[in-house]
Amino acid sequence: MTKKKYLMSSAQMTIIAAVQEEAVVQGSRILRSAFIVVASVIYLVAPSAHAQVQNNAGGAGQSPRTPWGDPDLQGLWNNATITPLQRPESLGDKAFLTAEEAAAMEQRAAEGFSQANTPREVRTEPLPVGGDVGAYNSFWTEEGTAVVQTGRTSLISDPPNGQLPQLTAEAEARIASPAYRRLADVRDGRVPADGPEEMGLSERCLWYRGIGHISPTGYNNNYHFFQTPDALVILQEHIHDVRYIFLDGRPHLPSSIRQFAGDSRGRWDGETLVVETTNVREPFIRRWNLPQHSLGRGDLSDQVLLVERFTRTGPDTLNYEFTVNDPNTWTKPWTGSLPMARTDGPMFEFACHEGNHGLMNIMAGSRAEDAR
């Protein structure tokens, strides 16, 4: 089918990209980021064509189709799950759970969430000055309640043992360095930050991910997919990150141009959209996106290549597979699989924005302490 330009009726899709520059401020290198509008892409879709997007279920063995004939990935998808990234050692070589084991795991998770919601104490008097008032309970989180639909014991499918590959000697040295350990300690709350330079971009409400990897978090696990003949746009609920993936065959950016989420290019391989992401900015992912947060133990380098595969496997399911290849970090590539489920939404605003008051108030409180 010949591809044509279609427009989404009465809608304008504004694409936001993140660029960053390095600046030298009093001898310290800091990352400054600015969100700029790089494009406003408008496509017209006649009402009948829009209805076709919703109703065209495709032929036998085919996923739903867009008016221009590509598999239709559009919609609001959720990937919350209690399945861990790595297989628990207690499961050995067991790759899949039985139905009974999956039900038992989900029951244990439900009991854990219920217990976490139980008040630890009921206070009638204020705490002494400096007392711990606690934090969010599981009412405020959305970690998922079920194992992945495939019943896998881990999101990692390769290596077959469900574990991350061995780190290279170079990676071991990186994560053992004092600078790395310092940032990890600040991130994990073991020590306070010395200044704003040690606060991550997610705490500034600027950016959450260092690469395009879609993995479940503690909450806000929704992703809104928008699709045109030439692009796929993914709006992530968490810190409202936006990925713009070109599908028009253009080459990757020159290796000298590095971006927060790297540079993504997509192509169709039958029913599957294959996306390759390169050009990740190494200082960013090291300082502000230490990968234990989403990828397990390790430290990505600027040589990382991320290959993602999106496949509609049913009216309400989208399979997401990813392969991480970083020869400077792991001794071999590794692959994970994460089925996503359609959700009706709506996806609410993530009310976190650049220039919010959190960091300013933290700094003001710290300076007040210094002045005592």
List the model feature ranges, each with a label.
Residues 1-31:
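N-terminal secretory signal peptides that target proteins for export/translocation
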Residues 12-14, 34-46:
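Bacterial N-terminal signal peptides
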Residues 2, 6, 27, 35, ...:
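PEST-like low-complexity, intrinsically disordered acidic/proline/serine-rich tracts
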